[in-house]
Regions:
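Ligand-recognition elements built from short beta-strands and adjacent flexible loops
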Residues: 130, 172-277
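Beta-lactam-recognizing serine transpeptidase/beta-lactamase-like catalytic domain environment
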Residues: 1-171
Length: 277
């Protein structure tokens, strides 16, 4: 069995229990059990996250270290400070290296496991076809009247992309969601997926078909990329958009506008509207 000393050592190495040092006021330390007062019950509950308190930025800092090869860095909000009139950089901020906490080989194993969570497990609602995403869902009872609520939850998902060489990490937490099944994979993972879709364009992340293939169920709705048909004649556009529901209007034979635009994602067999001119 994992002993409390080793568990708490790794928890603290990951940055929990102390402020991250982010350039943001009001940061908290979080709450951990005192090692001297930690019994078998506290050891067990700490292992799955009950009885302790951590901040969202601590979560991001820790997971970033786990997936970047094992190095813990101080997070920051502002990369460069600019002179407003000339846009000259007057101060730059670089992440402080706090040390290596795990081996690269361990980091690679965890990344693969977390990619599997999205492709085959509880994080499947964050999956994007032809892109590699790793992540972990969370479903935590909220504290109420000195104990844990049986009906109120914090639903979360923390994920990263690409799973094999991360460029972005996303943490989503939703407290006391209404009218939905109370699971992080149901509520938070789809929100993270939408953020990843935007990040693909912003960061110019290329498709990668070498990842773990998704296990689809009848509940899944597959998303596909809309081809860019602007400038094509209508007959050619129809061939390219085969499999989509096409609606078009206007006078002429050439596509002058397309919605959704080429490169966007829609549900399989979704509708594409064309304007002709």
């Amino acid at each position: 069995m994992l002993q409390k000393e080793k568990l708490m050592s790794y928890i603290k190495k990951l940055g929990f229990g102390t402020k991250t040092g982010i350039d943001l006021n009001g940061e908290g330390n979080g709450i951990l059990f005192n090692l001297d007062k930690m019994g078998n019950v506290e050891l067990a509950t700490t292992a799955f996250g009950q009885g302790i308190s951590v901040t969202p930025i601590q979560q991001v800092q820790a997971v970033s270290a786990i997936i970047n090869g094992g190095t813990l860095y101080t997070p920051f909000l502002v990369k460069n400070y600019l002179e407003p009139e000339t846009n000259t950089i007057i101060k730059s901020v670089n992440a402080q290296n706090k040390g290596t906490i795990i081996k690269k080989e361990t980091s690679d194993l965890v990344k693969y496991a977390l990619e599997s969570v999205v492709a085959k497990g509880s994080g499947h609602n964050a999956y994007i076809e032809n892109y590699r995403i790793g992540g972990k869902t969370g479903t935590a009872q909220t504290v109420e009247n000195g104990g844990y609520s049986s009906s109120k939850y914090i639903l979360s998902f923390i994920g990263f992309m690409p799973a094999n060489d991360p460029e972005i990490i996303v943490y989503v937490a939703v407290e006391n969601a209404k009218g939905v099944v109370q699971y992080g994979g149901t509520v938070a993972a789809p929100i993270a997926r939408n953020i990843f879709l935007s990040a693909i364009d912003i960061l110019d992340i290329k498709p990668d078909t070498e990842g773990i293939p998704k296990e689809y169920t009848w509940l899944d709705q597959k998303y596909v990329v809309v081809p860019d048909v602007v400038g094509m004649n209508i007959d050619e556009a129809k061939k390219v958009l085969k499999g989509f529901n096409i609606e078009y209007s206007g006078n002429g034979e050439t596509v002058i506008y397309e919605s959704p635009k080429g490169g966007m994602y829609v549900k399989e067999k979704g509708t594409v509207v064309l304007m002709l001119g």
